[in-house]
């Protein structure tokens, strides 16, 4: 009898520790494709994208698990496990998420996994706890879909550093007004044949005039940040090397009301004189960082790329209205099994 009593006590104690703080012990199960659950999940993804510090926006792919806990004295807490996919829109891109393309398998897709605790009270959602990480698809799986497609390459690869410097140099040479400085290397891929390196990066306007800058380290970013997102490719041909780069300006980061507009770009196919060997350093923000100090990673992991709510104990959270749900809301009634929910795009 004593053993049964002790077992019951331990069971209750474990339940108290595993439940989100401020909730009752009981929770109700809801279908992952329930319209209200999807509304909460879209709110969570919206929060994620609003707090991204670098990398690319993510979009909801699947709701894996959901529990709804009653919260004392009012409201309820949604405990969600979500799968997301990386889009082609950078974190600074003002394009609405609904208009962002999902990065496909052949483009070396990246999947995110997130846990959220979201309080619903008086018709508002407050994010109480977040925890995310992300991983690229394996090279083997990409090769199954597209044997000759470009694969993600570490940021500190000498070929990548070389390509970024060449592209930035070409951009500043073409732009005869403001000197731009690299602030983030967002993505890099290589193709063995024909030998080429493809990079995506963010630059910002400085107080220096282009194209001739003796010491880039002395150039400071403007008070009202003017960012541009660039895509560039460096091709190794029999006749030499060729770099192409195109950049798009984002609205000014202040009271910015200016719409996104094309920034000066190097026309495709213009050869650019390159140094004899890859440079030893790469300009990042206001500093010159040696290439060997760049991180040995192939993408910006959500674990480090966004600023989350620290823990479930910050119960005040950040209150905001949920985004408008677009498209089919899924099944209105409970499904069997309740979870996981439908896959909106594809699984990695």
UniProtKB/Swiss-Prot annotation:
PTM comment, free text: Phosphorylated by FAM20C in the extracellular medium.
Q: List the disulfide bonds.
A: 32-339, 89-100, 114-132, 146-149, 208-219, 230-247
> Which terms does the record give in the GO molecular function aspect?
cysteine-type endopeptidase inhibitor activity
Q: Tissue range of expression?
A: Expressed by the liver and secreted in plasma.
Which InterPro entries does this entry report, sorted A to Z?
Cystatin_dom (IPR000010), Cystatin_Fetuin_A (IPR025760), Cystatin_sf (IPR046350), Kininogen_Fetuin_HRG (IPR050735), Prot_inh_fetuin_CS (IPR001363)
A single GO cellular-component term on record: blood microparticle
Per the record, residues carrying Phosphoserine are 134, 138, 307, 311, 314, 316
Keywords, alphabetical: Disulfide bond, Glycoprotein, Phosphoprotein, Repeat, Secreted, Signal
Keyword Translocase belongs to the record: no
Q: Which residues are glycosylated?
A: 99, 156, 176
Q: Which residues span the membrane? A: none
Where the record annotates domain Cystatin fetuin-A-type, the positions are 19-133, 144-255
The record's annotation in Pfam families points to: Cystatin
Main location, first listed in the record: secreted
- Region forming the signal peptide: 1-18
Tell me where in or outside the cell this protein is found: Secreted
As for family, the record states: Belongs to the fetuin family.
Which PANTHER family would you find in this protein's record? ALPHA-2-HS-GLYCOPROTEIN (PTHR13814:SF6), FETUIN (PTHR13814)
Q: What is this protein called?
A: Alpha-2-HS-glycoprotein
- According to its UniProt entry, this protein's organism is Meriones unguiculatus (Mongolian jird)
């Amino acid at each position: 009898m004593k053993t049964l009593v002790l077992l019951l006590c331990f069971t209750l104690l474990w339940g108290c520790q595993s439940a989100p703080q401020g909730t009752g012990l009981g929770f109700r199960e809801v279908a992952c494709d329930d319209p209200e659950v999807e509304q909460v999940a879209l709110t969570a993804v919206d929060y994620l994208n609003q707090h991204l510090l670098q990398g690319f926006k993510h979009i909801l792919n699947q709701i894996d698990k959901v529990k709804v806990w009653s919260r004392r004295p009012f409201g309820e807490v949604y405990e969600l496990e979500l799968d997301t996919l990386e889009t082609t829109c950078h974190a600074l891109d003002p394009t609405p998420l609904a208009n962002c393309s999902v990065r496909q398998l052949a483009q070396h897709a990246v999947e995110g996994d997130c846990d959220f605790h979201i309080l619903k009270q008086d018709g508002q959602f407050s994010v109480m706890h977040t925890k995310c990480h992300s991983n690229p698809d394996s090279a083997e799986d990409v090769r199954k879909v597209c044997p000759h497609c470009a694969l993600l390459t570490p940021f500190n690869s000498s070929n990548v550093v070389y390509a970024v410097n060449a592209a930035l140099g070409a951009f500043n040479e073409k732009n005869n007004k403001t000197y731009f400085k690299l602030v983030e290397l967002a993505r890099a891929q290589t193709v063995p044949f024909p030998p080429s390196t493809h990079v995506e990066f963010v630059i910002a306007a400085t107080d220096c005039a282009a194209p001739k800058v003796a010491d880039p380290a002395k150039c400071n970013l403007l008070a009202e940040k003017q960012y541009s997102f660039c895509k560039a490719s460096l091709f190794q041909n029999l006749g030499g090397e060729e770099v192409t780069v195109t950049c798009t300006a984002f609205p000014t980061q202040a009271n910015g009301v200016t719409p996104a507009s094309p920034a000066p770009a190097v026309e495709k196919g213009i050869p650019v004189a390159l140094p004899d060997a890859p440079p030893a350093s790469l300009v990042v923000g206001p500093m010159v960082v040696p290439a060997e100090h760049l991180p040995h990673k192939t993408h910006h992991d959500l674990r480090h790329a966004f600023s989350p709510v620290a823990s479930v104990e910050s119960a005040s959270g950040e209150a905001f209205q949920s985004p408008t749900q677009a498209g089919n809301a899924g099944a209105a009634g409970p499904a069997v099994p309740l979870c996981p929910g439908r896959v909106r795009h594809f699984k990695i």
